Structures are given as structure tokens and as C-alpha cells.
């Protein structure tokens, strides 16, 4: 088995910004020259996450509204008292969704469903430079 580690850099808008990173991950897998294995994506930071979703405008709207219902932005959070930042909800949302995702690949192709894309989600309250660590294990 071979391990290859790469990085994907992003500029996000914050506030539940959802970015389709599927093509970037496909490119990294293709360039790895590994034929079959798994690719693990890890988001650096505690206010962003990664998942799969059908990247469709109305579903993305539903996705954002769901987070506002589950973990509302405009209620008191103890964390907000710590640093004076109003992003307690951002940390909670990111921890619930999670910082990592693993996708298998065969013949250098990700084994995703037809309507399944890899989505980076930034829950923080401001634009940020973000980083996804991509680690490929395969042969």
C-alpha cells in the first residue's frame, strides 16, 4: 500500500457556505497514480466540516435552513463569552457534521452515486481561507 498526502485550499464566504469540492478531489486521486483504494478528506479547523450531498440549489437552501432550525445562530452560547466571537453555533454545527470523510475509488474513479457530491461546509461567521487535507491510501 502507498500513502499520498495532498492539500486543497479554499476561500469560503462563511455562514453555512457550501462548496462542491468533488472535482478537486477527483483531480488529486487521478494525479496520485494509485488505481484503487480510499481517499480520506480532513478539514483543518473547528468551524467547518465535510459531507456528501446532492449539490442542487434548492437542497442547499433546505440544508442551510435545517441547520438554523437544529442549531440556531441567534441564541446565547457560552462559547461566545470566551473570545467575544459570536460563533458558538458554528463550532456546534461543525462538530455535529464532522471534520472527515472517506470515499473509496477504483480505476482512479471515486465511487460516488450519480447525485452525490463532496461538499465542504463553512459554518463560521466570516470569510476564511480554508484547508482540506487529502490522504490517499491505495495501490
Where are the predicted features?
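Active-site histidine-anchored catalytic micro-motif
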Residues: 1-139
Amino acid at each position: 500500500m502507498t500513502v499520498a498526502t495532498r492539500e486543497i485550499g479554499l476561500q469560503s464566504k462563511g455562514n453555512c457556505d457550501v462548496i462542491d469540492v468533488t472535482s478537486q478531489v477527483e483531480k488529486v486521486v487521478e494525479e496520485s497514480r494509485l488505481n484503487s483504494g480510499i481517499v480520506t478528506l480532513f478539514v483543518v479547523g473547528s468551524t467547518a466540516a465535510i459531507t456528501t450531498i446532492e449539490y442542487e440549489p434548492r437542497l442547499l437552501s433546505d440544508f442551510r435552513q435545517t441547520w438554523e432550525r437544529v442549531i440556531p445562530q441567534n441564541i446565547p452560547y457560552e462559547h461566545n463569552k470566551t473570545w467575544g466571537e459570536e460563533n458558538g453555533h458554528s463550532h456546534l454545527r461543525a462538530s455535529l457534521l464532522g471534520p472527515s470523510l472517506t470515499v473509496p475509488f477504483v480505476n482512479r474513479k471515486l465511487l460516488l452515486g450519480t447525485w452525490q457530491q463532496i461538499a465542504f461546509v463553512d459554518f463560521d461567521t466570516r470569510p476564511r481561507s480554508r484547508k482540506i487535507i487529502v490522504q490517499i491510501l491505495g495501490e
